[in-house]
Amino acid sequence: MKVAIIGATGYGGIELIRLLEQHPYFSIASLHSFSQVGEFITNVYPHFRNVLVHTLQEIDAEKIEKEAEIVFLATPAGVSAELTPKLLAVGLKVIDLSGDFRMIDPSSYELWYKRPAAQEELLRKAVYGLSEWKRPEIQNANLIANPGCFATAALLAVAPLVRSGIIEEASIIIDAKSGVSGAGKTPTTMTHFPELYDNLHIYKVNQHQHVPEIEQMLTEWNRETKPITFSTHLIPISRGIMITLYAKVKEEMKIEQLQKLYEETYEYSAFVRVRSQGEFPSPKEVRGSNYCDIGIAYDERTERVTVVSVIDNMMKGAAGQAVQNANLLAGLEETTGLQHMPLYP
């Protein structure tokens, strides 16, 4: 099956290229850029030499439709909202890595993203692509909104607790840390080497745009869920996310019960690895892979659960999950082309 990538020169775009070029079923028909049309992708990224021969093309929906069946949008917020109607109109299926179609309520998007929302009809039709929890919907979708990186790690961590109803609905606290690639390719003062090396930054306190998509899914799982407390930090690694999540249980429990809950929940999810009791993951242990590793602890004294989850923000947090969703969309085994062992050390 032929695919196209729009926004091919960003970090999400080049990770899609890496995965799709090695995929046994998908093949890249075309790569598209806004600012570097006519350039060979190998001139922009020399590490693709002797692997790719593509020239970056302008964006023409009708031309893309003649070459591809699925389009990946690795574009900034606001851009996908403009492009997607044109792509859908010519019969293409769209997997969008931006936040433009993640929220059903347009006012929620406008509040958190500070820009106009996409067409309301498309917001209602878009499927939120949290692969492990939306498989049937993804398989029948025309438009998939790939989840945010923080949202993916947080939702996989908290899903068993919320869906089982064992935690107090207003008790969820999420402490999130991300590698610098999560901030995108464009450099800023905060991502500048002298500012970040041997340092860390907290940013967007109580204002991160992934909050509403997390809360939207929590409410779908449990209507009684209340707003969460969510903080994000930038740490001096290139890839990786670590979520530390805290919640208070309604009734006294044992760690063995929680361990069993997580193991049973993700028993048939190939990319979610629940650590043995007392073990906790680190971001390096999933680097370059589509895995989400989870560890659980329980404090009987405070009756609080602590859940630690880690992902590679460029893989399970972006391109990897997008390809996982494309596999589901194409009727393939969802692990196809994604069975990479983590890069370690």
From Swiss-Prot:
Matches recorded under PROSITE patterns: ARGC (PS01224)
Transmembrane segments: none
EC number(s) given by UniProt: 1.2.1.38
HAMAP family (alphabetical): ArgC_type1
Any one GO molecular-function label of the UniProt entry: N-acetyl-gamma-glutamyl-phosphate reductase activity
UniProt keyword terms in alphabetical order: Amino-acid biosynthesis, Arginine biosynthesis, Cytoplasm, NADP, Oxidoreductase
Keyword tRNA processing: no
Location(s), subcellular: Cytoplasm
Annotated Gene Ontology cellular component terms: cytoplasm
Record organism: Bacillus mycoides (strain KBAB4) (Bacillus weihenstephanensis)
Chemical reaction(s) catalysed: N-acetyl-L-glutamate 5-semialdehyde + phosphate + NADP(+) = N-acetyl-L-glutamyl 5-phosphate + NADPH + H(+)
Record's protein name: N-acetyl-gamma-glutamyl-phosphate reductase
Family per similarity comment: Belongs to the NAGSA dehydrogenase family. Type 1 subfamily.
Role this protein plays: Catalyzes the NADPH-dependent reduction of N-acetyl-5-glutamyl phosphate to yield N-acetyl-L-glutamate 5-semialdehyde.
Keyword Amino-acid biosynthesis set for record: yes
GO biological process: L-arginine biosynthetic process
InterPro entries membership: AGPR_AS (IPR023013), AGPR_type-1 (IPR000706), NAD(P)-bd_dom_sf (IPR036291), NAGSA_dehydrogenase (IPR050085), Semialdehyde_DH_NAD-bd (IPR000534)
Listed pathway(s): Amino-acid biosynthesis; L-arginine biosynthesis; N(2)-acetyl-L-ornithine from L-glutamate: step 3/4
Enzyme class at the top of the EC tree: oxidoreductase
Active site residues of this protein: C149
